């Protein structure tokens, strides 16, 4: 008998006398006892705020990203222990891959994005500096900093590992401690993964805590610096969202709810063609994976009226071949629902759907003691007059075919559910894809457009990717999670800071034009990453650009554009006073002015960003460069990236060009 424990204030707490007995969905026998312990939720929040939050916020974004990478690697090394428990939830090995490997992969992804896309500091910069005064002495900048409370994560039963890790990763990267509350039915698998997290020793005390069982008065104790992220049913979300304490303190509440997701077969998809076959294959996958218990599963299959019979026959034949039984048996394609209560709920909702739709296949169950149900396909002859098919979700291996007249009608039907997490379109016609997108994008959190070109690399209709947002409008909850760094920002406060360039530079750890320049003891290209200071600047001598320079560059490169070679034609151009120097010639001369050629800590020039030209340079003009260290970002164990602001001015002091130069610089001297 499994006895998953809560983890609060650094201590494991066993189930209490009122623990709930969990009946196995496969064996129909008791497999675990969970909950019932008297947890002190006030103490848990205090522990998170006093210990976990300060420890996490003391780390830079990159340090937290490295922590996540190490944790993901630790979990990956022990994942077979989780796969051993996985069948108890009713899930097959294939189902478990989505949950276990998918969750670990999500953590790896956030670790990588944190290193690549966030600064190696404590303040996230959101957007460009805004000049608020005429002379540049008063500026504005949007920043984001971690919330100083705790994140409460209330997760669903269907993905006990992924559901936890996909919320933990962005919150911990943001620097916010978390209290995890898994669904009781599958909490033993969540607890096994959570126990590994604690055993890794990689997170600071108070960074994560676990609630097995009821949340008691936890939500009543939250404040404006806290956040709630919920995944589950629309009914439960409505109940939680209405908590008076959450409303009173405007506590952030993100909800990802079940939704009646649609898949559209394009009018160009002929029976037996690639797009038709892809539609059928993905529909079968969505109906059967996790026994249909996915918030992103296809529930409404919208097909042209002329293709309805072809699709019905193809799907019915494929679904009839699906083997249903003990998920530990590799021969079984589909396992059980997560509980007998979940199966009963599906059967109840299926009965209500049958008032508007006919059963084409399924609506039966294997002769087994567990919570099994055969995949079921319905068809609704008049989806315009129907309401249940657009409102009632049977959260299991059930989908309904809906015939449509044309593309506009298909989009109308897809939108009829009041908002969804994802809608799919199977077409090779770009015009159809654009029409459906314009008609439907506002109603769905994600549009998955599939055809023969994308299929070899596609991840599937029902797979939320950590790079992309997961959420949707209306019935889907109106929230978002994941989406790369967007998901991290849900746990941060965006603040507008205003002040002088020096103040903003100090806050953001980034040199801002107008802030103080620093003069180093020698050329910065001869100094290591650690030695270079933010704001360190050199001013180069000037170089005169001659007509011979321009003509030689034109012949040498082949760039004989008339503005460089034909004075009369150039004067007819509203941008040029006559022949002018090539922009790339100016960049080359600039490099010649500021580069220190001897071997040193600078390893490579790896990029150039935000290049712009403000004023043409004519023969006889001179240019000089101001090169300033703008920011520094650690990249590997041996070198980091230094971003330089390069500003080119002419003999009159007027700016002619500006760009950001990226160099990789060694931490130490060779």
PLM region descriptions:
Residues 1-136, 321:
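N-terminal Rossmann-like NAD(P)+-binding subdomain of aldehyde/semialdehyde dehydrogenases
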Residues 118-277, 404, 457:
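Rossmann-like NAD(P) dinucleotide-binding subdomain of oxidoreductase/dehydrogenase enzymes
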Residues 521-581, 667:
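Catalytic strand-loop segment that frames the active site of acyl-thioester-processing enzymes
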Residues 524-534, 613, 617-670:
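HotDog/MaoC-like acyl-thioester-processing domains
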Residues 572-581, 585-630:
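Hydrophobic beta-strand-centered segment that forms part of the acyl-chain substrate-binding groove
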Residues 30-37, 53-57, 131-132, 152-153, ...:
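Short, well-ordered beta-strand elements within core beta-sheets of diverse protein domains
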Residues 26-33, 200-205, 224-225, 306, ...:
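Conserved C-terminal structural/oligomerization subdomain of aldehyde/semialdehyde dehydrogenase
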